[in-house]
């Protein structure tokens, strides 16, 4: 993994696997708390990406309804019903944060992630 500043990250090609990194002033790299994302096109100080794991909701209201239902079910039953997953939707970063950083994975690391996930498939 390598940590990139925003200027260098925007130069990377479409199809780059990354997680959002810490801001410059933060002390720790904690990739375990962030989800994997795929970077697509870069724009001036912005970019398009897709989270590998996201909730399928067609609006903010629907997302809030799903969240509320899942949390209520978990409080009552200890587990929620299925939460719909979205594997297709892309979004713009849209924060224009100059000091943002990104942790980027190389091909060997991506292969290792895939191999690790394949051990879970039954």
What is each model feature region?
Residues 24-47:
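Short, surface-exposed terminal/edge motifs of secreted or surface/virion proteins that either
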């Amino acid at each position: 993994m390598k940590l990139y500043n925003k200027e260098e990250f925007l130069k990377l090609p479409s199809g780059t696997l990354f997680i959002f990194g810490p801001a410059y002033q933060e002390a720790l790299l904690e990739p375990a708390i962030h989800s994997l994302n795929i970077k697509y096109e870069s724009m001036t100080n912005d970019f398009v990406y897709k989270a590998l794991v996201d909730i399928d909701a067609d609006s903010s209201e629907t997302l809030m309804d799903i969240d509320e239902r899942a949390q209520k079910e978990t409080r009552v039953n200890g587990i929620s019903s299925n939460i719909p997953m979205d594997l297709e939707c892309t979004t713009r970063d849209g924060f224009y944060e100059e000091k943002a950083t990104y942790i980027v994975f190389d091909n060997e690391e991506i292969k290792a992630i895939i191999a690790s996930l394949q051990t879970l498939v039954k």
